[in-house]
């Protein structure tokens, strides 16, 4: 697909607002290197790749939601109080 149009993407997404939100989340995943693209990069920017994936029907909200679920360790460990010693 040489050029991506909004109409191509709207075949797979309900409206333009959902398209913007979906493309934003997917482009961020691609830009941070957290996820691999489902189409060839072809020297495009992450935003264009995200739109091409949506237009191809390879990415939808279900895919994005699954990718957002992360089972990492918590950012903060449980606080353990240390005794204060008076000087």
Swiss-Prot record:
* Keyword field contains Transferase: yes
Assigned EC number: 2.7.7.6
GO:BP terms for this protein?
DNA-templated transcription
Q: Does the keyword field hold Transmembrane helix? A: no
Q: Give the reactions, separated by semicolons, that this protein catalyses.
A: RNA(n) + a ribonucleoside 5'-triphosphate = RNA(n+1) + diphosphate
Q: Which UniProt keywords apply?
A: DNA-directed RNA polymerase, Nucleotidyltransferase, Transcription, Transferase
Q: Which Pfam families match?
A: RNA_pol_Rpb6
Task: Give disulfide pairs as residue numbers.
Answer: none
Enzyme class, first EC level, given as a word? transferase
Q: Which GO terms describe its cellular component?
A: DNA-directed RNA polymerase complex
Q: Name one GO molecular function term.
A: DNA-directed RNA polymerase activity
| SUBUNIT field | The RNAP catalytic core consists of 2 alpha, 1 beta, 1 beta' and 1 omega subunit. When a sigma factor is associated with the core the holoenzyme is formed, which can initiate transcription.
Function recorded in the entry: Promotes RNA polymerase assembly. Latches the N- and C-terminal regions of the beta' subunit thereby facilitating its interaction with the beta and alpha subunits.
Q: Which family does it belong to?
A: Belongs to the RNA polymerase subunit omega family.
Q: What is this protein called?
A: DNA-directed RNA polymerase subunit omega
> What is the gene name?
rpoZ
């Amino acid at each position: 697909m040489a050029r991506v149009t909004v109409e191509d993407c709207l075949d797979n997404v309900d409206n333009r607002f959902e398209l913007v939100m979906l493309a934003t989340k997917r482009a961020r995943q691609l830009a941070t290197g957290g996820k691999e693209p489902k189409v060839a990069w072809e020297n495009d920017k992450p935003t264009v790749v995200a739109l091409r994936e949506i237009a191809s029907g390879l990415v939808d909200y279900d895919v994005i939601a699954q990718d957002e679920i992360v089972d990492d360790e918590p950012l903060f460990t449980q606080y353990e109080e240390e005794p204060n010693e008076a000087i």
